[in-house]
Amino acid sequence: MLPRLFCYHVCMRKQVSFLASRARLWLQNPAPFAVLLGTALLYVGALVSGLAEDVLDNESIVLTDGWLAHWLAAHRTPVGIGIFDAITFLGNWEVAVVVLTAAVVFLWNRRRRSALAMIVATTGSQIVVSLGKAGFGRPRPPAVLTVITRLDASFPSGHSSISVALYALGFYLLFHSTRSPRLKRLWLALAFLFPLLIGFSRLYLGVHYLSDVLGGWGVGLWWSILVVGVPDFVRRRSAANTQAADLRSRPNTAK
């Protein structure tokens, strides 16, 4: 039994590795990559807009919002409040400005494109969040359910969008520029962990509903895909054009 399982595991790894290499080769072509990028942006945008429509129409997600807010309020502990209050601090705009400024200063002379990507993603996502809050005007959870009192609108969550557009994107860029497999695993884990912790902290402290957090994640993800995908597409198209020009410039030796 064990030899069979081992053989199956090895064969599956080889198949996955082969498919991944073929996919990378296929995506070197700018046309398939453009289709993939456009599909991802449209899909995430549709998810966020659909979520916003459900919130406006009081669909089932609103019932889930209320149930989860009451359940978390009934199960809070002083230790939990202290932990998640510290975690949610990372998503405050003051902290985000400091982190973004430090990242830009560090990256500007090393990886300027990465610095610009973080600026555009963070700024763009916060503009969308501000417009969403002003447009939807959704009230925060009732004061009896909250630990932190906030007076601005609830949907979408600014902390959640920052957790993706700033922190997750930053860790992804570190993952992309690191050669060490161990560090790659660390950056990838943090890219998922930070949004999850910051998003859950907003729920635990009662300052946001679940749909607010999901909407904020979606906004941050859309901008992150945009700032990573568009430069990659430009690079692929430039490489393809250079390769085509090189082929055209070669003398025709066919007889």
Regions found by a protein language model. Give the residues of each.
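N-terminal transmembrane-helix/juxtamembrane module of multi-pass inner/ER membrane proteins
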Residues: 3-95, 134-148
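Alpha-helical transmembrane segments of multipass membrane proteins
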Residues: 41, 45, 49, 125-129, ...
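Membrane-water interface of alpha-helical transmembrane segments
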Residues: 29-37, 85, 112, 178-188
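Membrane-interface loops
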Residues: 56-57, 63, 98-100, 105-181, ...
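Membrane-embedded catalytic cores of phosphoryl/pyrophosphoryl-handling enzymes
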Residues: 14-22, 145-255
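C-terminal ends of transmembrane alpha-helices
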Residues: 49-50, 130-140, 197-208
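Hydrophobic alpha-helical transmembrane segments
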Residues: 35-36, 94-97, 115-120, 185-192, ...
